[in-house]
Each structure stands twice: as C-alpha cells, then as structure tokens.
Amino acid sequence: SLTFRMIPYADPRSGLKRLRDGFALDWGVLGIGEPVARALRQEVKGLRVFPGLAGPACSVPSTQQGLWCFLRGQNRGILFDLTERIRSLLGEAFVLDDAMDTFFYADGRDLSGYEDGTENPCDGAAHDAAVVRAEDGLMGSSFVAVQRWEHDLERFRSYSSDQRDAIMGRRAETNVEIEDAPASAHVKRSAQESYVPPAFMVRRSMPWQTAHQQGLEFIAYVESLDRFERVLRRMIGADDGIVDGLFTFSRPVTGGYYWCPPISGTRLNFSSLGI
C-alpha cells in the first residue's frame, strides 16, 4: 500500500498522463485523492477529504494524500520494481509519503486470530455496493476508504477467550456470530445490513508488521463514501455513545478517501480529471 503527496504548487498533469498511459491494470489498484482533483480545478462528484473524527475516548485521524496505490506481487522484489516504476511515471510533482507491505495470514484472518470480511457481498451484490453507476465519466469507477489500524496484541491476548469473543462478536474457533453479544461488539457496530439504507461495502483487510508495530490495512470499496462514513461514525459512538470494542486494543493511525477511475480498454480513464 503506497501513498503519494503532491508537491505544493506543482502541476500534476504530465505525471498523471504518464501514469494513465503506463499503469498496467494487473499491477493493482490506483486511487486519486481530493487534493489532486482540487489542484486540477476539477470536481469528482462524491470525492472528498477523509474526515478527522472523535468519539468517547477514541479518535480517527485524517492523513489524506493525493494518490494511493495498492500493488499486488508474489514477492517483495516485484513490489519494489512496481513502486520504482510508478515513482518514475509520476515524476517530480509527487513524492512517496508512505509504503507498507501487507501479507496474507492464516487463511485470511486478522492478526488477532479472527476472520475478517466474512459478510462481504458477492457477485452482483458486490458490484452494486462498490461500483458507481452514474451516467457520466464516473460510470464504472469506485471510491475507496483506506485506514491503517495499529493493534496492541499484547493487551488483546491478556483478555480471556470469552472477552476477546465479546469484543468481536464472533467465536474465534468457529467464526459463528454470538447472538447475545454486547452492543459494543464489532459485528453489531459494523453490521452493514442494519443501516437505512444498507451500507454494504466490499472490504479487504491486510495484515502488516514492522519491528515494533503491527495491525491491519483496512480497505473498503464503495459506490458512495457515505456508506463507509456511516459505519465509521457508529463505530466511534457518534450515534449513541457506544464505542466499538475494537478500540480496546486497536486504533486507526491513517485515513484517506480516494477515487478509483474507470477503465477504458486497457488503461485508466482520467477524463473526469480533465486528462
């Protein structure tokens, strides 16, 4: 996962044109942040800056950048080469601000040991949740919310298995949802079908680790950022003062919103950016 910031007063057009023409679709996913659209004096309807939020004894930071990439590769050598290629395409108007390698853990589990993304929509429902259907240059595009969460696994492991299950609202061993889980359980705070209208998202959580920290990179693809934001506000207790149990051992340290442009033929379509 890469984020790039724009150099103040730099013109991003030439770099974005090279990126449009040179970004191979099998490299991964590309997202454009509101600062880039603003610099181009273009409006991408529905795109906005990630909000910094606060709730009872918890907070959600905004670290909005100009561009985000989620690259795929079988090894770090491939990812290194792709990163260098993107930096070369972007040129001097963008600077790599952050890079985090993520990985697949224990059959798709979070580092806490619990399965994640269990209730992702599938097939047509996934398309409806994540893909914009507007009759303009946005058709076929998507919006994405990206957060990095940092876990305190030592604290989490100090809880009993029942306490850990109550935080998540699921049994770790069976992944079965606990019917009488507390209102603060993550499955209850984030139940996408409980919103009006429903807030279904196509979510992906990828573990990460450095020498002294670890956690998950949370990625949610949506046809409208309102879907993600409604869930996030409930998680911090903005609706009823009840904070998601995740905050007992984890906290978000980054947050950004991005627009993933549609595809025309074999390349990205930047027409909504005037490019």
Regions found by a protein language model. Name each.
Residues 1-275:
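Long, histidine/aromatic-enriched segments associated with O2/redox biology
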